[in-house]
């Protein structure tokens, strides 16, 4: 029998929904957020029920938020607030502190390393993860799925990530929830404080609402340069 390095039978699984915002080699702030739930979570059901109650048939995308959609976006935050079975971690790369793309020598490697840190910080002890990552266009030579899995497993010293696959955001409501959380948490870093005397935008109000309603549950961590130093996977 092949001696594969596999976790024990019955190891609990978690699903990680990974989304990014920004252009890593261009924007002042680039971030990767990961929403994690157990495989038996009823959070998807609760989000689906809210979608049905609210009559919302579109996708939740922070970048497309306007006044008309603010109520239903806040409702999504309320569903998350009222549910305990999830976690969210966001890794923020600030180019003023460290230009990750320049240090890595490649913007796609930079994205992989930032994503790997977010996934690693999302891992739950004694579990194995499957990562669903929002579709991100890369050249054919970039093996994002393999590289992120290798980086996280190498750092953990075991098979904590079973696989990574890129999917479109319309495949799952929680992929869209990860998009909303990622965008809302990064927004204040990009836009600064609200201007006094001016009505805040819908995005600003949702960002403030998410911070208030999910206080302590959506930590933002700076990118750790040690992920750059992690040896690359053998080609």
Where are each of the predicted segments found?
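Phosphate-ester processing/binding pockets and catalytic centers
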Residues: 1-235
